[in-house]
Amino acid sequence: MASGPGAATLKKCLEVLRDARNDSEQLAALLLVTKAVRAGDLDSKTRRQIFDAIGFTFPNRLLSSRQAPPGCPEHTFRALGLTLLACFCTEPELAGHSQVLNKIPTFADVLLSPCQPDCTSMVDDAYQCLAAVLATPRGPREMVTKGAASALCQAYVNGGYGSERALALLLGLLAVSEAKCWQRDAPHLLAVLSKLSEEFVRAEDGSQFELCELLPRFIPLSPPLAEVSQGSECVRQLYKGLASILGSKLSQSQRDPALKLAASLTQACGSEWIPAGSTGSKFLALLVNLACVEVRLTLEEPEPLEVEGKKEVVTACYVLIEMGIQECLKEEESLLDEAQRMQLMRIMEEAFGAVVFYLRQVKEEELQDPFVFASVRILGAWMAEETSSLKQEICELLPFLVRYARKLFKEGGPAENLPQTAGLVSSDSSILGQDALRFLLPGFCHLTAEDRPRDILISEGAPALLCDYFLHQWGVLTSQPGSLTSTEMSLQTLCGIFLNLVVTAPNLIRQEKTFSSLMDTLLKSLPFLLPQKDHLVLAANIATLGLVMARILSSSAVLQKTGSAKEFFRATICFLSQAHTAQADPGSHGLALAVSPAYVSAWDDIRELWFLGMQALASCVPLFPWLPQAVLQAQWLEELSELLTRVTAASVDFELIAAFQGVLVGLARASKPCREVILSHHGEEWANLYGMAALEQCLSKQ
């Protein structure tokens, strides 16, 4: 408790409060208590004594009162009630009490009311209460739902007394409840961003670098910033300010926050925040160049990340470099010309050399560091697109990448639907549950097509890991309703990797037990997936992979007359047989062969898979005696005969004719009933018409 005369006075006041017989006596004692509270610092025990003597009831009545003692300002009672609550709120236990949380609208109202010179203490008390509430477990959520977030925004934009405290509280609230704040109060937050953006463009005294630190908190990832007019204007202002800053000579402490702000804009808007034209293209090239230089200068040091805050800066640079990769690969509407692309690719290659160098130094105890994850993630983005550079360095790093991905997958389990970009990570956040494999898969798909990296991946046990990962991702897709784009893309890429392995390392498929488990999952998954038309690309991948694996694993137990095997082949027949149809030919009065309407939108993605699937099905026919019967039951031969009879021969290209002939010959040789169906539907005639010599020969034999 405070010492000296103040302590004695406070003690007497507390006695009066406890013994008060009416409101007048209690109010008189409260006024003395308030004076004592303001006069000096109180310890926790004293504050608790005040609360025990007063409770919440009387302050609540003071806050709701619209009267005042004769000769006093009308807000006297409210000011007294706020002072008491501000005193109580210094105790965390009381700050989180429902009686305080219920007063959040009152605190917000004080911030938005016109502040007279004699009201500043009320505003101070309201801010003190809100700051205390923010520090409690329930506080941030209650502040959002009860209107404190919007009030803080308005208080800052209005620029009245205490507006800087409003901004500080907003920053704290966004740090813990960003998504909820934007979901509920986007217009008010955009108003704050608008004010900050205008200040940013005008600032010339060094404060623009302080604003670079603040602004990322007010840049939302969703909804997209550029979709609303107010947001678009903010983006324009921020670009203008950053272009001015980054075009000047900067110290390290000035450049770092500018790069982080640019990365935040990139995460929110991609490259769309940078205007088209030569000015924008030069700025983008400068930005990516600066990011690459920063990565090299930092990661090539012996102790690269000892400096405080360096990880956040380099991670921001990763976001900018990823934007550079995407712009260099754009075929249309790229901000960069060809010369700029070539230059940036060379500069980025040097930066990724530094990333590889850093990752090779990572120790076992550092594997949980989020910065390692960010570095692996951005390297995965490079490996997905650039397959010719740093090949030797990547090969040497592959054992680490496989080990790292396995550790995260086995220990944490993959986290679904992480943002695709490299991401700004906090140095103290956990990577438990983050999914490194997802970002490495496209690169692995390229590498499994090449001998040396494929051999390294196999020797490090990557195929078994990838099989386990496929089974897990399939479980995620089937257990969570709705569209899981990233999960589906991962499954498609995994199918591409396995197709590479089937073609180049068939013995591996026979010997690795996990591929039998994978085969079993493929057999069961296609019948489930195919009826869902929005998953056609994944279904095509699974159908084709299952067929080519079935050729290798035909003698395995999982494929021997099992119900799931027959269901799978029925589904593949359905997928392959429904890809083409007859439609009116604009160039003639006849019909032309065309891709079926249900397949048109996906055909570019599944065309090669369809042809490979037809080839694999033909190879499977002699291996599975019951397969021709499945084709007969599906009536595919009748439908194909009718299709080839109806359309003009000129509309069927040679590659398609070869695909049909391969399956038809296989069926005619393996099954007398199939041969008879083809013959009974004028097979010899259209075989001759389409130049299917092998089929003609097969049909002519008795």
From Swiss-Prot:
One of its GO terms (cellular component) is dendrite. GO terms for biological process: neuron projection development; regulation of neuronal synaptic plasticity. It comes from the Eukaryota. Pfam families: Neurochondrin (PF05536). Keywords: Cell projection, Cytoplasm, Synapse. It is found in: Cytoplasm, Cytosol; Cell projection, Dendrite; Postsynapse. PANTHER family: NEUROCHONDRIN. Probably involved in signal transduction, in the nervous system. Required for the spatial learning process. May also be involved in neurite outgrowth. Belongs to the neurochondrin family. This is Neurochondrin. It comes from Gallus gallus.
